[in-house]
Regions:
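Short, Lys/Arg-enriched, Gly/Pro-containing loop segments at transmembrane-helix junctions
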Residues: 258-267
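Membrane-water interface segments at the C-terminal ends of transmembrane alpha-helices
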Residues: 2-37, 46-156, 180, 184-200, ...
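Extracytoplasmic catalytic/substrate-binding loops of multi-pass membrane glycan-assembly enzymes
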Residues: 214-216
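Helix-turn-helix DNA-binding elements, focusing on the entry/boundary residues of the two helices
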Residues: 162, 204
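Short coil/turn motifs that cap or connect alpha-helices
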Residues: 83, 171-173
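The alpha-helix within a helix-turn-helix
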Residues: 166
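Glycine/proline-centered hinge or cleavage motifs at structural transition points of membrane proteins
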Residues: 169-170, 183
Length: 275
């Protein structure tokens, strides 16, 4: 053992434990609270169940659309020799740093009744605000970067020689993508989809502006907090944390069974490497 490493490691462990407590203690305090059975009863109320249904339906719809649209975009950004490539990738990152409420304003300006896209649609009685479509648009805006960025990293980690070998054997670009690139990059893509679903499920700010009604679970939680205080908001918060924890746990289990224990979750190695 190299001299000096142990004290440094202990110092880093101490500093890291402070951060870990800050991250984990609030969640554990919620999950282990003695009133959780009362919160489950509150969640079983019709208004809570409706908000939960809207959240699950919208977040799952958003993830499907992010997979269908975001993964191909990531493949192009990872493999194509595009001009100003760094600029296009930087654009993908922008929604991650734009405040949620500001993102909602931008979406409303674009897709609202007077927006450049919303106005022509509104004249045809197609509305993109205050409905499920508005919720999905808001969720995609804030969560899609997780899918795209993870997928870019996943596709970039696939050995280009494998794609070249498939091309020399006569495979089309579509077959190379479907039979070589996508399977090898899938663990990293799955990590991005998992994070995106959790992010979409908990989205509040942009949804508040784009589609206050129907209430998603985060908005319902805010309404209950405004009317009943902390006690009224805790059941919805408990439900969201349980769903997020379950999603991460399922992702870790799937990674173990598929042989990618270190990469299907957001905690490990680069995509495309097995055990």
């Amino acid at each position: 053992m190299i001299r000096g490493i142990k004290p440094t490691f202990l110092l880093f462990a101490l500093l890291g434990s402070i951060m870990l407590v800050n991250l984990v203690l609030p969640i554990c305090n919620l999950l282990l609270h003695p009133d959780w059975h009362r919160w489950l009863a509150a969640i079983a109320q019709p208004a809570s169940l409706e908000a939960l249904k809207i959240s699950l339906l919208s977040s799952c719809s958003a993830v499907v659309l992010m997979a269908l649209l975001g993964v191909p975009l990531a493949y192009v950004l990872a493999r194509a020799n595009l001009p100003f490539k760094r600029f296009w990738i930087a654009l993908v990152f922008l929604p991650m740093v734009v405040p949620d409420l500001a993102g909602g304003i931008l979406l409303l300006q674009t897709f609202g009744p007077n927006g450049i896209i919303g106005q022509p649609l509104d004249s045809r009685n197609i509305e993109l605000t205050n409905n499920l479509a508005g919720i999905v648009l808001a969720q995609i805006f804030v969560a899609a970067p997780f899918v795209i960025v993870s997928s870019i990293a996943a596709f970039s980690s696939v050995d280009l020689k494998l794609e070249i070998a498939a091309a020399t054997l006569g495979d089309s670009r579509w077959h190379i993508f479907r039979r070589v690139s996508l399977p090898l990059a899938w663990p990293g893509i799955a990590a991005g989809l998992t994070l995106a679903w959790i992010r979409a499920l908990g989205e509040f700010g942009s949804t508040l502006i784009m589609a206050y009604n129907p209430h998603t679970l985060p908005i319902y939680m805010w309404v209950k907090f405004e009317s009943d205080g902390l006690a009224g908001a805790l059941p919805a918060a408990f439900c969201l944390v349980v769903l997020a924890t379950a999603a991460v746990g399922i992702s870790m289990l799937l990674s173990r069974f598929t042989g990618y224990a270190d990469i299907v979750t957001p905690f490990g190695k680069a995509a495309g490497t097995g055990r």
